[in-house]
């Protein structure tokens, strides 16, 4: 067994004392530009259709008051997170989205920019959001406190949700991977292999779902300040 179960998440790849783990975050940028000067294949056509569908959905979520071009930011956010989630499933590639360093870096500036824009440009609208419609006057002070707290913890919940989902799946696969070499029965090895494949398929689905959830929630937070 491993001495430390969480050691799989340690950024330990270095050359000349330069950490190379976080470079995997930008590997997707090497794949995307080829679509601009090469004939599109079936995969690229499918990917373009996915991006177009996301663009239409995010545009609907932003509403008529959303700024033109805003969907590009959220589609790019979805692509970046999904690429890194999938790269983390490959052996010996650093899972950058399992660290709050990356997820908070994505969530906090987005939330802060939305808040600054909303409170500076739509102050009355932001104050109105603190008290839901139909709230009794007696409960208004409590609702203001509750809404303020729920608003402040949004970047934290976004970041922790993504990080926790990535860590949970990788820990399960690590535990199964370390159990296999100690087993001498072919039946147990076969069961572990089948379970590992099923977990890998499940983690692939989680990689897509979590990137979609992160992008959609960011879009919804943006639509509230318009």
From Swiss-Prot:
InterPro entries: ATP_synth_F0_asu, ATP_synth_F0_asu_AS, ATP_synth_F0_asu_bact/mt, F0_ATP_A_sf. The chain crosses the membrane at residues 18-38, 74-94, 100-120, 162-182, 187-207. This is ATP synthase subunit a. It is a multi-pass membrane protein. The keyword Magnesium does not apply. One of its GO terms (molecular function) is proton-transporting ATP synthase activity, rotational mechanism. Its main location: mitochondrion. F-type ATPases have 2 components, CF(1) - the catalytic core - and CF(0) - the membrane proton channel. CF(1) has five subunits: alpha(3), beta(3), gamma(1), delta(1), epsilon(1). CF(0) has three main subunits: a, b and c. It comes from Aedes aegypti (Yellowfever mosquito). Mitochondrial membrane ATP synthase (F(1)F(0) ATP synthase or Complex V) produces ATP from ADP in the presence of a proton gradient across the membrane which is generated by electron transport complexes of the respiratory chain. F-type ATPases consist of two structural domains, F(1) - containing the extramembraneous catalytic core and F(0) - containing the membrane proton channel, linked together by a central stalk and a peripheral stalk. During catalysis, ATP synthesis in the catalytic domain of F(1) is coupled via a rotary mechanism of the central stalk subunits to proton translocation. Belongs to the ATPase A chain family. It is found in: Mitochondrion inner membrane. GO terms for cellular component: mitochondrial inner membrane; proton-transporting ATP synthase complex. The keyword Nucleotide-binding does not apply. It comes from the Eukaryota. Keywords: ATP synthesis, CF(0), Hydrogen ion transport, Ion transport, Membrane, Mitochondrion, Mitochondrion inner membrane, Transmembrane, Transmembrane helix, Transport.
